[in-house]
Amino acid sequence: MSSEDREAQEDELLALASIYDGDEFRKAESVQGGETRIYLDLPQNFKIFVSGNSNECLQNSGFEYTICFLPPLVLNFELPPDYPSSSPPSFTLSGKWLSPTQLSALCKHLDNLWEEHRGSVVLFAWMQFLKEETLAYLNIVSPFELKIGSQKKVQRRTAQASPNTELDFGGAAGSDVDQEEIVDERAVQDVESLSNLIQEILDFDQAQQIKCFNSKLFLCSICFCEKLGSECMYFLECRHVYCKACLKDYFEIQIRDGQVQCLNCPEPKCPSVATPGQVKELVEAELFARYDRLLLQSSLDLMADVVYCPRPCCQLPVMQEPGCTMGICSSCNFAFCTLCRLTYHGVSPCKVTAEKLMDLRNEYLQADEANKRLLDQRYGKRVIQKALEEMESKEWLEKNSKSCPCCGTPIEKLDGCNKMTCTGCMQYFCWICMGSLSRANPYKHFNDPGSPCFNRLFYAVDVDDDIWEDEVED
């Protein structure tokens, strides 16, 4: 190796190491060579797809995805002793998403670039071409069809093959080739199957999007602080960004209040909802367990064929058979009516507790004719009638009577003074303040100047003035 070639190689490798970061260029340890990773800049809304008639049978054949990043092309090279004065670098070009024919076309163009730069270093020109011109050179546009090269059609050639050999570049969808494909030995599509390729592309795209997000600055719309993306989180549907500290507090408040269905984007009127994975990343394990449990319960509540065991010590979900009102808990074996949640009673009407009479009456009054018939069938007409009558009586008593302060018996006052006597327990009480009166001297309450009802024995009593005047004249 001449000293000029040696110096040129060292300078070129040093320049590449200073231009590119460690993820894009790595110098080999034992030989004059290295590895470069070429990350292509894709146009916006770039789509990839697999056609339904692909050679490989896929469960999701015919799918289409919009991506922002594709896995890099990898150029591995070794510099011979007489580079750059006489010989080109020996290299291999590998990529997951380009077919062997397309990679071979790129290899051929790298050879042409060497011929143009013969006698001078060429690695930077190669890397710039691969990064900036690959898509245009191969006529790749969106949507781009993913394909795996068929090894049965491949006739490999060596790097010393005739330069006059023409290669089919392929297009955006990798057009069909009538003649046998010729593939360069240096072109490697390093992927096992089309299904693996799809998953690798999607995983890489997601990882790169996260990496770009983490390195940018965002303004949190809650605390109005500017923070790195690594300290922020975005909602997947709307892409609204907030800092993790604010979202953590927001999620914790909602979960403690039991509002697990309301972990929406804080942006007004935005319907985006946080995923369970995002919630788990921000809140503590105990709160996430509560969130997970309440979310499952709310989901089960939306299922018409799921009820809960009414036993307080159990409360496990029970599947309800269609057309059957009996539920049997698989945990405690309790048989219950799925309508009233009491012990199963066969064809007998459901029993209604006093607390539920008001709800039953309101439900019946607001129901249409069809729902009224269902309620009559479920509870029985006598129970419905009883509910209506009892609630009417209760409303009348609340409006026209007061309860005895001693025994609670409803008392109606028609006329007379405000000293009342309970018909149930015979207790004296004041109709104005509802206080109990002394049995020895019940009128002291109205004669005592310190009493709030002083001189109010006949307060609010309607007296016929004409009769009173007649009695005075007599």
From Swiss-Prot:
Record domain RWD: where: 11-137
Where, per the database record, does this protein carry Phosphoserine? S348
Q: What does this protein do?
A: E3 ubiquitin-protein ligase that plays a key role in the RNF14-RNF25 translation quality control pathway, a pathway that takes place when a ribosome has stalled during translation, and which promotes ubiquitination and degradation of translation factors on stalled ribosomes. Recruited to stalled ribosomes by the ribosome collision sensor GCN1 and mediates 'Lys-6'-linked ubiquitination of target proteins, leading to their degradation. Mediates ubiquitination of EEF1A1/eEF1A and ETF1/eRF1 translation factors on stalled ribosomes, leading to their degradation.
Q: In which pathway does it act?
A: Protein modification; protein ubiquitination
Instruction: Give me the reactions it catalyses.
Output: [E2 ubiquitin-conjugating enzyme]-S-ubiquitinyl-L-cysteine + [acceptor protein]-L-lysine = [E2 ubiquitin-conjugating enzyme]-L-cysteine + [acceptor protein]-N(6)-ubiquitinyl-L-lysine
Q: Where does Zn(2+) 1 bind?
A: C220, C223, C243, C246
- Zinc finger intervals, IBR-type: 289-350
Return the EC number.
2.3.2.31
Motif D-box: positions: 37-45
Q: Where is this region: Interaction with androgen receptor?
A: 361-474
Keyword GTP-binding in the entry? The reply is: no
One Pfam family cited in the UniProt record for this chain: IBR
Q: From the UniProt entry, list the residue stretches annotated as the region TRIAD supradomain.
A: 216-457
Name the Gene Ontology molecular function terms of this record.
Answer: nuclear androgen receptor binding; transcription coactivator activity; ubiquitin conjugating enzyme binding; ubiquitin protein ligase activity; ubiquitin-like protein transferase activity; zinc ion binding
* Subunit and interaction comment: Interacts with GCN1; interaction takes place in response to ribosome collisions and is required for ubiquitination of EEF1A1/eEF1A. Interacts with the ubiquitin-conjugating enzymes UBE2E1 and UBE2E2. Interacts with AR/androgen receptor. Interacts with TCF7/TCF1, TCF7L1/TCF3 and TCF7L2/TCF4; promoting Wnt signaling.
According to UniProt, the tissues expressing it are described as:
Widely expressed.
What ranges of residues constitute the RING-type zinc fingers?
Answer: 220-270, 404-433
The record's active-site residues are C417
- Origin organism of this chain? Homo sapiens
Q: Which residues are involved in binding Zn(2+) 2?
A: C238, H240, C265, C270
Know the name of this protein?
E3 ubiquitin-protein ligase RNF14
Q: How is it modified after translation?
A: RING-type zinc finger-dependent and UBE2E2-dependent autoubiquitination.
